Amino acid sequence: MIKLIVGLGNPGAEYTATRHNAGFWLVDQLAREAGATLRDERRFHGFYAKARLYGEEVHLLEPQTYMNRSGQSVVALAHFFKILPNEILVAHDELDLPPGAVKLKLGGGSGGHNGLKDISAHLSSQQYWRLRIGIGHPRDMIPESARAGAKPDVANFVLKPPRKEEQDVIDAAIERALAVMPAVVKGETERAMMQLHRNGA
C-alpha cells in the first residue's frame, strides 16, 4: 500500500512550467482530485497535504528544498509518520523516456536524477516506487548526423518548459497515470503496471 506520494520539482514560479517539475504537476492533480490543499509545512521542508484518496489516507508532498536536496524533505515526513520506503511513490521527470511515456517501477538506480539520488541516500534504500514521467532527452533534438561528439545540455533542457506538442502528450501521460492511482494506492501495483504499460505508455 502506498502511504506517501512525492512529486519532485524545484520551488518558485520561474520553475513551475519547466520539465523538471513534472512530478509537481502530478501531485497537484492528485490534490485537486482529493479536494486537498497543499500547504507549506516547515517540519517537512515542503508543501504537504493529508488527503483521502480512493478510500485511503495518503500523504502528498512537494519538497521545497530544490531538487538535489529532496531527500531531506522525504525522510523528514517518512520518519515522522513511520512510512517505509516501499510505501513511498516518487513521481519525477524521466530523460530516458520520450514525452508521452510514463512507467511505474520499484527500486533501481537514480539514472542521473539528482532528486532520486538524494532520496535514496537519505532513506538508505532504493526500494521505493517511482512514477517516471517521460520528458525526452536533449540529444533527441540534435539531428542524427550531428550527434557524434555533441554534448547535449541536460541541465538547461530540464529547466525549460516543454514545447506545446510535448506538453500535450505529457499531460495525457499524467492522466493515464492518474487512472491507475487507485490500484497503486491500494498496493495492487502489478495490475497498475500492466494497465499503465499496456496503454501505450
From Swiss-Prot:
Record-level GO BP terms: protein quality control for misfolded or incompletely synthesized proteins; rescue of stalled ribosome
PANTHER family: PEPTIDYL-TRNA HYDROLASE
Function noted in UniProt: Hydrolyzes ribosome-free peptidyl-tRNAs (with 1 or more amino acids incorporated), which drop off the ribosome during protein synthesis, or as a result of ribosome stalling. Catalyzes the release of premature peptidyl moieties from peptidyl-tRNA molecules trapped in stalled 50S ribosomal subunits, and thus maintains levels of free tRNAs and 50S ribosomes.
One GO CC annotation: cytoplasm
Name of the molecule in the record: Peptidyl-tRNA hydrolase
Coiled-coil segments: none
Pfam families to which the protein is assigned, alphabetical: Pept_tRNA_hydro
Molecular-function annotations in GO: peptidyl-tRNA hydrolase activity; tRNA binding
UniProt organism field: Burkholderia thailandensis (strain ATCC 700388 / DSM 13276 / CCUG 48851 / CIP 106301 / E264)
InterPro entries: Pept_tRNA_hydro, Pept_tRNA_hydro_CS, Pept_tRNA_hydro_sf
Knockout or disruption consequences: Essential, it cannot be deleted.
